[in-house]
C-alpha cells in the first residue's frame, strides 16, 4: 500500500469507499462512516465499516464521529443479528501496525459472522466458497440495519 499511495496519491481503501458509496454493496452510511460488504467476500455476510475520510488512527476521532461510529455499529450488528438469527461473530479493528501511524493506512472494522462450518475445500485446500453474493448480503443487512436505526431513534 505504501507504493500504491506514493504512485497514485491516495490509499486503496479511499478508492474502495468512493466505489462502494451508494453502490449495491453498501449496507448503511452515516455522515462519517460507511458499512459495506466487500466485492470479493470470503465469508457469507462479512462486512466492513470504514471512516469516509482518510484516517490513520481511531484515537483521534471527534465526538460526532464517535456517535456516528456507535450508531453504525449498533445498527449493522443489530441488523446482522436479525437477518442471521443472532450468530456469533468476530469483530476486528484493523489499526496501523506501526508506532507512528502510517499515512497510507486507513483504519477500519471488519465483521465476520459465523454461519457456516468450514468444509473440505476450505480446510484442505484453502479455497473458500461463499454462496451469498455480497450485493444480496448488503441488501438484506441494509434493510435490517435501517429498521434498527428506526428503533434506536424512535421512528418505528
Features from the language model and the residues they span:
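HIT superfamily nucleotide-processing domains
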Residues: 1-156
Amino acid at each position: 500500500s505504501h507504493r500504491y499511495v506514493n504512485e497514485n496519491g491516495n490509499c486503496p481503501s479511499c478508492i474502495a469507499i468512493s466505489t462502494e458509496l451508494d453502490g449495491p454493496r453498501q449496507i448503511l452510511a452515516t455522515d462519517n462512516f460507511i458499512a459495506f460488504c466487500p466485492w470479493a467476500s470470503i465469508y457469507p455476510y462479512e462486512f466492513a465499516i470504514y471512516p469516509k475520510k482518510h484516517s490513520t488512527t481511531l484515537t483521534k476521532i471527534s465526538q460526532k464521529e464517535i456517535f456516528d461510529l456507535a450508531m453504525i455499529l449498533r445498527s449493522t450488528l443489530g441488523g446482522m443479528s436479525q437477518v442471521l438469527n443472532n450468530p456469533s461473530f468476530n469483530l476486528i479493528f484493523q489499526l496501523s501496525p506501526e508506532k507512528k501511524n502510517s499515512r497510507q493506512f486507513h483504519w477500519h472494522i471488519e465483521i465476520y459472522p459465523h454461519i457456516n462450518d468450514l468444509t473440505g475445500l476450505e480446510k484442505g485446500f484453502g479455497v473458500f466458497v461463499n454462496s451469498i453474493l455480497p450485493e444480496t448480503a448488503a441488501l438484506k443487512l441494509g434493510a435490517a440495519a435501517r429498521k434498527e436505526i428506526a428503533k434506536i431513534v424512535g421512528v418505528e
